[in-house]
């Protein structure tokens, strides 16, 4: 899922 991947990247960027 692209949306899930994008959200995952956002979370990784946060941490």
From Swiss-Prot:
It comes from the Eukaryota. This is Interstitial collagenase. Its EC number is 3.4.24.7. Its main location: secreted. Binds 4 Ca(2+) ions per subunit. Belongs to the peptidase M10A family. Its cofactor is Ca(2+); Zn(2+). The N-terminus is blocked. Tyrosine phosphorylated in platelets by PKDCC/VLK. Keywords: Calcium, Collagen degradation, Extracellular matrix, Hydrolase, Metalloprotease, Phosphoprotein, Protease, Secreted, Zinc. One of its GO terms (molecular function) is peptidase activity. It catalyses: Cleavage of the triple helix of collagen at about three-quarters of the length of the molecule from the N-terminus, at 775-Gly-|-Ile-776 in the alpha1(I) chain. Cleaves synthetic substrates and alpha-macroglobulins at bonds where P1' is a hydrophobic residue. It is found in: Secreted, Extracellular space, Extracellular matrix. Can be activated without removal of the activation peptide.
């Amino acid at each position: 899922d692209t949306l899930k991947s994008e959200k995952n990247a956002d979370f990784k960027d946060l941490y």
